Every structure is written in C-alpha cells, then in structure tokens.
C-alpha cells in the first residue's frame, strides 16, 4: 500500500467537489504521457512488474482549497485512513512525503512502514539530496528500485 498526499489543484473551487483517483491514475494519458503524473505510475510499475499488488491512496480524501485543513478534518481523514488500512490489510505501507509519514506514525498502524520522499517535481531539491543526483524520472526510478529491494524482497 502506498499512502501519499496528492498534488493539489491550482484551481480550487468551493462550489464544486471533484472526484477522481489519486494522481489521476484512472486516466491513461496521465499515467503515460503527462509529465506531472507519469512518474507516479512508473514507480508503481516497479512493484507491479515484480508481482506485488499495489493499493494507492490519498492522505486527504477530499481536496480542500485555501488556507488548509482544520485540525478536526485532519483527524477525520486520519480515522478514515486507519479504517482503509485495516480493510485492505497490506503487507507493508510505503509513504511518499513527510505528511503521509507523520499520518501513518500518528495513527499507530502496526505494519512494516517504509518512508520515501514525495516523488513530485515540486520536491526536486529533497529528492536530489536523497538520491544524490539530478531528480530525473530515470534516476528516481532507479533509486526507488534500489531502495525497495532490501525492504520488500524484490526478488519476486
């Protein structure tokens, strides 16, 4: 299971609620072509090609524009996430980014938990520090594969 904070839309609307999959992975163009989202699917493919089933979920279940989430809403999303994890019952949890990492730690889910920097383009500086080179798709995927190998037995 991968838990991450989906990149937020630049066009918030309080009048319309949008539904979709995390990182727009329901959309073939977003999975394969769109430079802002294809990296996420490429990272997931590393796991899929090794026989893992992957469940990706967004930390925040509803996009809220503006100043941010109220503490009460964050707590609600944490409870929904806890129930989601209990329902899915994953072998391990991967988190992308500090917010997802903190959320998993806070709700005290007792599964193997492996934290990785959020792979978004906006996190390029942190990714560069972690992978030790330019954060291109290829370099991030190579590092992700090496990172996962000892943690998830990628010999499958």
What do these predicted regions represent?
Residues 1-94, 98-102, 107, 117, ...:
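A polyanion-binding, active-site-adjacent surface
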Residues 146-156:
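A charged, well-structured terminal subsegment
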Residues 110-147:
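Short, flexible loop segments at boundaries between secondary-structure elements
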């Amino acid at each position: 299971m991968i838990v991450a904070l989906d990149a937020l839309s630049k066009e918030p609307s309080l009048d319309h609620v949008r539904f979709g999959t995390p990182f727009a992975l329901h959309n073939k163009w977003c999975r394969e072509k769109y430079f802002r989202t294809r990296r996420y699917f490429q990272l997931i493919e590393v796991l899929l090609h090794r026989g893992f089933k992957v469940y990706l979920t967004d930390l925040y279940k509803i996009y809220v524009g503006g100043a941010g989430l109220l503490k009460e809403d964050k707590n609600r999303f944490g409870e929904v996430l806890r129930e989601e994890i209990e329902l899915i019952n994953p072998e391990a949890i991967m988190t992308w980014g500090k917010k997802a990492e903190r959320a998993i730690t806070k709700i005290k889910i007792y599964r193997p938990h492996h934290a990785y920097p959020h792979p978004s383009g906006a996190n390029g500086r942190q990714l560069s520090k972690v992978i030790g080179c330019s954060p291109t798709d290829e370099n991030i995927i190579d590092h992700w594969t090496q990172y996962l190998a000892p943690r998830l037995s990628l010999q499958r």
